[in-house]
C-alpha cells in the first residue's frame, strides 16, 4: 500500500510541475522513523490550504483547472499512512513548489 501512496504523490507532482519541471524523491532514516519526501517545483500550495489538502474532494485553487484529479488521492494517501501508524504532511512555499513528507515508524 505504500507504493500506492508514492504513486499518488508522484502522479500529483507530475500533473502540476511545469514542462521540464523537477521532481525529487528522497529517502532517509532516523533512529525511529523512515522518511520519504516527494518534492516538486510546481505552483505550490498556499498556507491556507495546507491543513485542508488531505480532506476528501478538496482541491486547492491552483488545482481547480486540472480536470484529471478529483480531490481523493491525498485523502487516500493520508488514510493508508495512518493505518501504518505514520504521518504525511505538506511542507510548502507558494510559488516555490511542494514537498510532501511521509514518516513511518521503523518498528
Label every PLM stretch briefly.
Residues 85-87:
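Conserved glycine-rich
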Residues 45-57:
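Short conserved segment of the HATPase_c
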Residues 96-98:
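Glycine-rich GHKL/ HATPase_c ATP-binding element in histidine kinases
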Residues 40:
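Acidic ATP/Mg2+-coordinating residue in the GHKL
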Residues 13-14:
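Short helix-loop "hinge" at the ATP-lid/N-box region of the Bergerat-fold HATPase_c
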Residues 73, 77:
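Short alpha-helical Gxxx[C/S/T] motif in the catalytic ATP-binding
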Residues 20-32:
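Short beta-strand/loop element within the Bergerat-fold HATPase_c
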Amino acid at each position: 500500500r505504500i507504493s500506492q501512496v508514492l504513486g499518488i504523490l508522484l502522479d500529483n507532482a507530475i500533473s502540476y510541475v511545469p514542462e521540464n519541471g523537477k521532481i525529487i524523491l528522497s529517502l532517509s532514516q532516523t533512529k525511529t522513523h523512515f522518511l520519504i519526501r516527494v518534492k516538486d517545483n510546481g505552483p505550490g500550495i498556499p498556507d491556507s490550504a495546507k491543513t485542508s489538502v488531505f480532506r476528501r474532494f478538496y482541491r486547492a485553487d491552483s488545482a481547480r483547472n486540472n480536470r484529471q484529479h478529483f480531490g481523493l488521492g491525498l485523502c487516500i494517501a493520508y488514510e493508508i499512512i495512518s493505518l501504518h501508524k505514520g504521518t504525511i504532511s505538506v511542507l510548502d512555499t507558494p510559488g516555490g513548489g511542494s514537498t510532501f513528507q511521509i514518516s513511518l515508524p521503523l518498528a
